[in-house]
Amino acid sequence: MKHAPEPAHRHGGAERCAILLVNLGTPDEPSAPALRRYLAEFLSDPRVVEIPRAVWLPILHGVVLRVRPAKSAAKYASIWTAEGSPLKVWTEKQAKLLTGYLGERGHPVLVRAAMRYGQPSVATQLDALKADGATRILVLPLYPQYAAATTASVFDAVYAWAARTRRVPELRFVNHYHDDPGYILALGRCIEDHWMRNGRAERLVLSFHGVPERTLRLGDPYHCECQKTARLLTERLALKPEQVLVTFQSRFGKAKWLEPYTEPTLVQLAQQGIRRVDVACPGFTSDCLETLEEIAQEAREAYLHAGGETFHYIPCLNDRHEWIAALSDIAIRHLQGWPTQTAPDPAALQAQALRARQLGAQA
């Protein structure tokens, strides 16, 4: 493999620590061509679709990418804002707020946001951090619960970038934070604020993104981590277990996924006479297609059509202060031992560069 050329090494340059926040991704616009590009990248990832390539790729390019882009584009159009894709907007706001919050706490680190699929890509943002002087980078996926299809795929993208890079910075990775006290606190405050404004429903449904059931048997901890998040949140809200339901959404394909499925569960609740439900999505840290369209629109319609009377979708953590504080705490723990609070000494850097030139360095 050919490694990308690097600028000539310069002595006396300031070394900085950085954080790369990574979310799933989004198309560039809500159009069929943009969705075709996005879905081709997303669904070609062997972490996402664990089917032999020789079987899956003809199906993907011969069937899925001919039909799905137009349907998905219409769904994205229903949630698109003047600022763009909600997921990208919220993720970039989180990066900006985290930069400020860490700076206020004495950690002036660089923070950038990347998308695993789409733009800005992981590789693009890692290159940008290097260009800004980052020599130590913490990779922090915005997935609280670990799954091979999400968290590990982010790591794959970083490893692929590193394999092409000549001078690789020090790298650290955050694996998960499904039981982090700050994360649970932020979720609890988010739901409590909703209750203060709208009252409390008869049931709280916690909907997580689904994955194929067989991944649980193959050793993926995702299901267990979702359940632990739900248990800790239930305790934080002082609810009884029977008042909370854990469900899984966004099933793709015909294989059995983690159950119970969100929409059928909501229909059953309505048919059982449960007239008011609240739905929150703890596994999503930013509102996106899966929350704003699949839950707030489609699931709501299904519940009301089945006889339910009041459906409230509780927004994701987005730019809530408690969430940014939790992200900051998570980052600081994983940055331990790196000089995040040491400001470069210009005089010392100049002296270092001078000594190097005296020994024959060119820069």
From Swiss-Prot:
Fe cation binds at H209, E290. It catalyses: heme b + 2 H(+) = protoporphyrin IX + Fe(2+). One of its GO terms (molecular function) is metal ion binding. InterPro entries: Ferrochelatase, Ferrochelatase_AS, Ferrochelatase_C, Ferrochelatase_N. GO terms for biological process: heme biosynthetic process. Pathway: Porphyrin-containing compound metabolism; protoheme biosynthesis; protoheme from protoporphyrin-IX: step 1/1. PROSITE patterns: FERROCHELATASE (PS00534). The keyword Lyase applies. Keywords: Cytoplasm, Heme biosynthesis, Iron, Lyase, Metal-binding, Porphyrin biosynthesis. SUPFAM superfamilies: Chelatase (SSF53800). It is found in: Cytoplasm. Its EC number is 4.98.1.1. Gene3D superfamilies: 3.40.50.1400. One of its GO terms (cellular component) is cytoplasm. CDD domains: Ferrochelatase_C, Ferrochelatase_N. Belongs to the ferrochelatase family. Catalyzes the ferrous insertion into protoporphyrin IX. This is Ferrochelatase. The gene is hemH.
